[in-house]
Curated annotation (Swiss-Prot):
The keyword Transport does not apply. It is found in: Endoplasmic reticulum. The keyword Ubl conjugation does not apply. This is Cytochrome b5 reductase 4. The gene is CYB5R4. GO terms for cellular component: cytoplasm; endoplasmic reticulum; endoplasmic reticulum membrane; perinuclear region of cytoplasm.
Length: 521
């Protein structure tokens, strides 16, 4: 529902925009950009109509404020007067009015729960929703069970509960120098991408992705541990072991005390994004307007972004936290270009186009080596299981819509034994816009299973390759299966009109829904 108003990055037709399930954009009036909204919030103008007072809002009171010039919306228990924001919302006033006078949390989460609404709307805060009196209960006994790794059944989601007693749990054990936290997921499709670990001071946090849910261990450790730790996964039984090094070789009487949402299993759509600060290690030009950024994770973090998923980068800009989605890439397509001293599990690479008149990317580009950027946990619905027994893989990319294809290419050519052919059709405006052209050509020369075709919409007269935009003629010639009944997957990513048109054309060419994956988040 609430959408960051932006005339900058990702631009309305940018391939790096995380699309939102078919929502239409409306043209904003001049002077209604994100920067204009930030200026308004800093102007000192009373945007709530309450002259700085915060109030407790009842359901009855919230319902009264349901008009365009008097619109209150509740998000996660906080009530905002969004009337001043109406003209700045790219989704239009009608989209905001869907939640007028009501709790808009679910609608907000459906579209873009990643938006930092607390920062964007802090000057519109009316107050909290009034909480109905609740009967107090003694949680001490339950807390004791929680720290023994027993998950209260009330915290198991209905989805997994229906599947039987195989819900996750955890335990811990120790030696003189080590503490091992063991997570029993009861699932067999668990790998190192499934677990995210962050610990800072005495706070320990481990998120395990189990199907469409997240199992959270969140503990204030009873003793200090070293920053470095190791993570092991036993895939055959779905067991994860996190091995911490004690700072002092003493015996622990207990692991620690529970922190927020500890030992809970929550649908991923209902969880907030968790950020950690990553350090900018390098930045290099790839094209005239695209850079390769390398960020280093904290030593106290384990995070591997799964293939086809994205993260959010967050920067403070003029006092407001701005968040944008990006798909991580490999440091290179070719092994000889890769730095062996940089382990994959500690570094994240991004190919990012810089928009000179934008708000976010120029600020990102101004960062110096050693500066920090906040990086979220991964999101996305691409499943690596789509590659099982795959024979033909077709990739359609436009501009920086190439980013999800980087890891897909690396994985496909090294880890899919059944693969016969990979074909990439890469759309750009000019030759100067083609990302990693030389690497793609060298990779295709080395591996005869790979074909790469470049298509330019505004080439110079000397260009001998294909020209134009995505079309039936281009695709019908390009998308030929190796065998009539071979298992095939077509991945497509680019600006929203490119992707939508491409998916329509693929259906016209008789590709089924299961044979198409569009990266629109």
């Amino acid at each position: 529902m609430l959408n960051v108003p932006s005339q900058s990055f990702p631009a309305p037709r940018s391939q790096q925009r995380v699309a939102s399930g078919g929502r239409s954009k409306v043209p904003l009036k001049q002077g209604r950009s994100l920067m204009d909204w930030i200026r308004l919030t800093k102007s000192g103008k009373d945007l709530t109509g309450l002259k700085g007072r915060l109030i407790e809002v009842t359901e009855e009171e919230l319902k009264k404020h349901n008009k365009k010039d008097d619109c209150w919306i509740c998000i996660r228990g906080f009530v905002y007067n969004v009337s001043p924001y109406m003209e700045y919302h790219p989704g239009g006033e009608d989209e905001l009015m869907r939640a007028a006078g009501s709790d808009g949390t679910e609608l907000f989460d459906q579209v873009h729960r990643w938006v930092n609404y607390e920062s964007m709307l802090k000057e519109c805060l009316v107050g909290r929703m009034a909480i109905k009196p609740a009967v107090l209960k003694d949680y001490r006994e339950e807390e004791k069970k929680v720290l023994n790794g027993m998950l209260p059944k009330s915290q198991v989601t209905d989805t997994l509960a229906k599947e039987g007693p195989s819900y996750p749990s955890y335990d811990w054990f120790q030696t003189d120098s080590l503490v091992t936290i063991a997570i029993y997921t009861k699932q067999k499709d668990i790998n190192l991408d499934s677990i995210i670990v962050d610990h800072q001071n005495d706070s320990f946090r481990a998120e395990t992705i189990i199907k469409d849910c997240l199992y959270l261990i969140h503990i204030g450790l009873s003793h200090e541990v070293q920053e470095d730790f190791s993570v092991r996964v036993v895939e055959s039984v779905g067991k994860i072991e996190i091995v911490l090094q004690k700072k002092e070789n003493t015996s622990w009487d207990f692991l620690g005390h529970p922190l927020k949402n500890h030992n809970s299993l929550i649908p991923r759509k209902d969880t907030g994004l968790y950020y950690r600060k990553c350090q900018l290690i390098s930045k290099e030009d790839v094209t005239h307007d695209t850079r390769l950024f390398c960020l280093m994770l904290p030593p106290s973090t384990h995070l591997q972004v799964p293939i086809g998923q994205h993260v959010y980068l967050k920067l403070p800009i003029t006092g407001t936290e701005i968040v944008k989605p990006y798909t991580p890439v490999s440091g290179s397509l070719l092994s000889e270009f890769k730095e062996p001293v940089l382990p994959n599990n500690k570094y994240i690479y991004f190919l990012i186009k810089i928009y000179p008149t934008g708000l976010f990317t120029p600020e990102l580009d101004r960062l110096q080596i050693g500066d920090f950027v906040s990086v979220s946990s991964p999101e996305g619905n691409f499943k690596i299981s789509k590659f099982q027994e795959l024979e033909d893989l077709f990739l359609l990319a436009a501009g920086t819509g190439f980013t999800p294809m980087v890891k897909i290419l690396n994985y496909a050519l090294t880890d899919i034994p059944s693969l016969r052919k990979v074909k990439l059709m890469f759309f750009n405006k000019t030759e100067d816009d083609i990302i990693w052209r030389s690497q793609l050509e060298k990779l295709a020369f080395k591996d005869k299973r790979l074909d790469v075709e470049f298509v330019l919409s505004a080439p110079i007269s000397e260009w001998n390759g294909k020209q134009g935009h995505i079309s039936p003629a281009l695709l019908s010639e390009f998308l030929k299966r190796n065998l009539d009944k071979s298992k095939v997957l077509v991945c497509i990513c680019g600006p929203v009109p490119f992707t939508e048109q491409g998916v329509r054309l693929l259906h016209d060419l008789n590709f089924s829904k299961n044979e198409i994956h569009s990266f629109t988040a």
